[in-house]
UniProtKB/Swiss-Prot annotation:
Pfam families: RecX_HTH1 (PF21982), RecX_HTH2 (PF02631), RecX_HTH3 (PF21981). GO terms for biological process: regulation of DNA repair. NCBIfam families: PRK00117.3-3. Belongs to the RecX family. It is found in: Cytoplasm. Modulates RecA activity. This is Regulatory protein RecX. It comes from the Bacteria. The keyword Chloroplast does not apply. InterPro entries: RecX_HTH_1st (IPR053926), RecX_HTH_2nd (IPR053924), RecX_HTH_3rd (IPR053925), Regulatory_RecX (IPR003783), WH-like_DNA-bd_sf (IPR036388). GO terms for cellular component: cytoplasm. Keywords: Cytoplasm.
Amino acid sequence: MSSLAFNYIVNLLSRREYSEFELRNKMQEKNFSEEEIDEALSRCQAKNWQSDRRFSENYLNSRVQKGYGVGRIRQELRQLKGVSSDIIDEVLMESEIDWYEMAENLLRKKFPNYNEQQTPKMKQKIWQYMLSHGFRSDEFADLIGQNQSEWD
């Protein structure tokens, strides 16, 4: 096994968590062979220095603190970080996050002067903001005093 490949991964992991996908990409950029990458990753995973599950838990917590909903977090983990859907589903299911309460807090923070008598244009702006942050319409529609059917 290439100690250079192993040392490279350990150096990266000493700074922050990475998904396996991210580490593979970084190592490919440094022109390590697939065999070297597989061996180095296997060794780190055996020592529990790299774990997609732990990475996903940490990523979930950091994105929740920034006000993102389950839809956006799921998409980022899958598409940008390469985490398997099974791991994402497990981590989300085990999290004790109240997505409705989170949507309510985000709405109050972003739109502090909001009331249900706002104009349709303002409600549409809020609707788009919440969707872009990964919240499902059923998590925030009643917060803005709208039925989902009003926007269809």
